[in-house]
Amino acid sequence: MIRGRMQGCIGVLCGVMAFAMVSVSAGEERVRESWPKVEFSAGTWISVGDTRWAHDASSVAGLGNPTSKLTYKDVGTNVIDLTGKFWFSPRVFGRLNGGFADIGGGRLTDDDYGTGQRLFSRTISNIAGNNMYYINADLGGRVKEFPNHRGYLDLFGGYQYWHTEHQAVGIGQVVCDPGAIPGFTCAAAGTSSNQGETVITNTANWHSIRVGASTEYRLTRRFSVLGTLAFIPISVLDNEDVHHLRGDLQQNPSFSMKGYGVGADVDVGARFMITKNLAANLGYRLYYNRAFSGDLTIHPAVGSSESFPLTQFESLRHGFTAGLSLIF
């Protein structure tokens, strides 16, 4: 099913590109002003992140729906962001963008539920690392230029890879209700253990097709506002979760998740031309992906694996951006 949806979305992407190229061909002769050949941008994305997932193993007696819900929230993740935009003609361009960062810190909240959504256990752990990075590769075309050289409208489509890895350290028991799941035990509320020890590592990978539009409108000769909106009609999720203290589970991984969903990328901001070829940029960016269908597979140390419905998986990252652009 994922393959079929991906093929369909690739068809849509090709259609958008075909439309853009037709518009490009029709507009080539109307271009009068000089056009940039290359634009290099370097900057930072001062971001916070949120990754959360849940699954339903209520087919097992005593367990609730959701059975487990894990929420990773990180702060202080300062991304180094680099972009190269290359114009093949006055109307056709390719763009390659990438960013990487170490996770600055944060918190994991791990909830487990019994029948009737009765909270059995809640633990918290500090997020000590690890990293995130992304790559966007787009092909686009200029379909509209505003009068008096005020700006433009571009359409584009391409591929996005987005990777986030969180490492959770130590365990603080916040809630423990042994009666919620008969036969299961948990540490007493208020206790702490495994301080300084990595207890969970979660690695989320999203592979996405995206289509969108970018625009810039010049308010003065030097100052302009700009924005980019990309819709992700298909995003394929590959997630692995390792519970390092669980001797009853494999360690590579303990849980694996596969799914597909949708998403969106948004960039808004302002640009000030310092010189003819140098610009300063300031803005705000948001990435969001959400799985609508998927499965979680448990990998026991002994015995065969077992799968359950993945009821939630979401990745969100947002924050302020700032940088410089060289335009030639």
List each model region and its residues.
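Residues on the lipid-exposed face of transmembrane beta-strands in outer-membrane beta-barrel proteins
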Residues: 82-86, 135-143, 157-159, 211-217, ...
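Transmembrane beta-barrel strands of outer-membrane/channel proteins
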Residues: 38-48, 96-102, 141, 155-163, ...
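Extracellular/periplasm-exposed beta-strand and loop segments of Gram-negative cell-envelope proteins
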Residues: 49-77, 100-135, 161-206, 233-267, ...
